[in-house]
């Protein structure tokens, strides 16, 4: 590409800078594709924001202690992420320093997850399970095994359930407790 004037070159460079800046803001604001490292990015963003709101000191030791306690309440894929990071008691490896050091200097969580991916690709292979919309799905058309899976994902169990309608009724009864009702934000 050949620029004929300095003004054209400045305009071109400014356009590149703005497009990269907007893309970076979009990645941080949640307008990103959820394909790569979704559990890592979501979890570390939530953890980082909880540290900010509580006014926690951003020292490496403090962040490590907070991460271990934050991981104590996790379930599912997030618990698996904590296991890979070494923040659970049964973890085989401990790579917490790869999270705490960059976070202590306020490195974006996207960059932290990219570094973790280079160390252990399993971290970025974690994906959240699809959320079940109980208002749109017909529970009566689901298999009993699928209904049991819904209860299991909620941490519930039905020992007295003998037939399908027992499971369906229990899910409908417990749904208000477990189904998130977030207001839809317009983009």
Curated annotation (Swiss-Prot):
Domain of life: Eukaryota
InterPro entries linked to this entry: ARMET-like (IPR045333), ARMET_C (IPR019345), ARMET_N (IPR045332), SAP_dom_sf (IPR036361)
An annotated GO BP: dopaminergic neuron differentiation
Function text: Trophic factor for dopamine neurons. Prevents the 6-hydroxydopamine (6-OHDA)-induced degeneration of dopaminergic neurons. When administered after 6-OHDA-lesioning, restores the dopaminergic function and prevents the degeneration of dopaminergic neurons in substantia nigra.
Disulfide bonds, paired cysteine numbers: 37-124, 40-113, 71-82
Presence of the UniProt keyword Signal in the record: yes
First and last residue of the signal peptide: 1-24
Compartment annotation: Secreted
Protein name: Cerebral dopamine neurotrophic factor
Family designation: Belongs to the ARMET family.
Gene that produces this protein: Cdnf
Name of a matching Pfam family: ARMET_C
MF terms (GO), sorted A to Z: growth factor activity
One GO cellular component term noted in the UniProt record for this chain: endoplasmic reticulum
């Amino acid at each position: 590409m050949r620029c004929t004037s300095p003004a054209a070159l400045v305009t071109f460079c400014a356009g590149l800078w703005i497009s990269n800046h907007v893309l970076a803001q979009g990645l941080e604001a949640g307008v990103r594709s959820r394909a790569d490292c979704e559990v890592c990015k979501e979890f570390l963003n939530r953890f980082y924001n909880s540290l900010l709101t509580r006014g926690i000191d951003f020292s490496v030791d403090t962040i490590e202690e907070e991460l271990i306690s934050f991981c104590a309440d996790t379930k599912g894929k997030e618990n698996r992420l904590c296991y890979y990071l070494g923040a659970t008691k049964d973890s085989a490896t401990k790579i917490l320093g790869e999270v705490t050091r960059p976070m202590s200097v306020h490195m974006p969580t996207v960059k932290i997850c990219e570094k973790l991916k280079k160390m252990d690709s399993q971290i970025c292979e974690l994906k959240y399970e699809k959320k079940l919309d109980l208002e749109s799905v017909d529970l009566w058309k689901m298999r009993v095994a699928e209904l049991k899976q819904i209860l299991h994902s909620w941490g519930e169990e039905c020992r007295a359930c003998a037939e399908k309608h027992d499971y369906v009724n229990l899910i409908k009864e417990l749904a208000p407790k477990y189904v998130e009702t977030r207001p839809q934000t317009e983009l």
